[in-house]
Each structure stands twice: as structure tokens, then as C-alpha cells.
């Protein structure tokens, strides 16, 4: 059994649909830390911003808490869970109202060091 350390970072209540976040997460899963940051920098999706922050935070956790080198980190697991929906009302004609649901999500990144 290998003795690899893993570090985790979580961003909660991101005001974006988990479906849109997962589209970007699939591009970086299994890649190295630096390669993932380069991919996120050039993707045309808004979801790249919050994901970039979480990956950066996980790398900082690895360096500060576990003393791991950022260059040796790879993204082991990354996923987006559904968060609570913000409920809003849009006024419509003749006194009616439509419900608007604004989705949120939680992004989790688990990185491990390779030897």
C-alpha cells in the first residue's frame, strides 16, 4: 500500500449551476496542478474562476499543512455537489408571479502528491 498524502479544499455556495461547473471539472480531472491552472486560464467558461480558486487553495493547503511541493501535486478527485437553491419571484401580468430558482453548488478538490 502506497503512503501518499492527500489534501482537500472545498468552496461552498458558489452561485453557479453544478452542471456548468462539472463541464469544466471534467477537463482537469487527473491532471497536474500546473497543467490544470493553465487549462483553466484559457477556457472560455465563467466556471473556471471559482474552480481556479479552489485548486489554488488546495495547493496552498498542501504546502502549508503537509509540506508538499506544488510541482508534484496531481488532482486526484474533483466534483461538484448541488447546494441550496435561492428562491426568487418574478412578477408577471394580472397579479401572477413565477418562481425563479437560482442554483448553487459546492466544489470539492482532492489533490495528492506523486513521487
Swiss-Prot record:
Answer whether the UniProt record assigns the keyword Ribonucleoprotein to this protein. yes
Known PROSITE patterns for this protein?
Answer: RIBOSOMAL_L22
Q: Which GO terms describe its biological process?
A: translation
User: Where would you find this protein in the cell?
Assistant: Plastid, Chloroplast
SUPFAM superfamilies tied to this protein: Ribosomal protein L22
A Gene Ontology term for the protein's cellular component: chloroplast
For this UniProt record, give its keywords in alphabetical order, as a comma-separated list: Chloroplast, Plastid, Ribonucleoprotein, Ribosomal protein, RNA-binding, rRNA-binding
GO MF annotations in UniProt? rRNA binding; structural constituent of ribosome
Key word RNA-binding present in the record? Answer: yes
What PANTHER family has UniProt attached to this entry? CHLOROPLAST 50S RIBOSOMAL PROTEIN L22-RELATED (PTHR13501), LARGE RIBOSOMAL SUBUNIT PROTEIN UL22M (PTHR13501:SF10)
Family membership noted in the UniProt record: Belongs to the universal ribosomal protein uL22 family.
- Role summary: This protein binds specifically to 23S rRNA. The globular domain of the protein is located near the polypeptide exit tunnel on the outside of the subunit, while an extended beta-hairpin is found that lines the wall of the exit tunnel in the center of the 70S ribosome.
The annotated subunit structure for this chain is: Part of the 50S ribosomal subunit.
Q: What is this protein called?
A: Large ribosomal subunit protein uL22c
Q: Which organism is it from?
A: Phaeodactylum tricornutum (strain CCAP 1055/1)
The gene coding this protein: rpl22
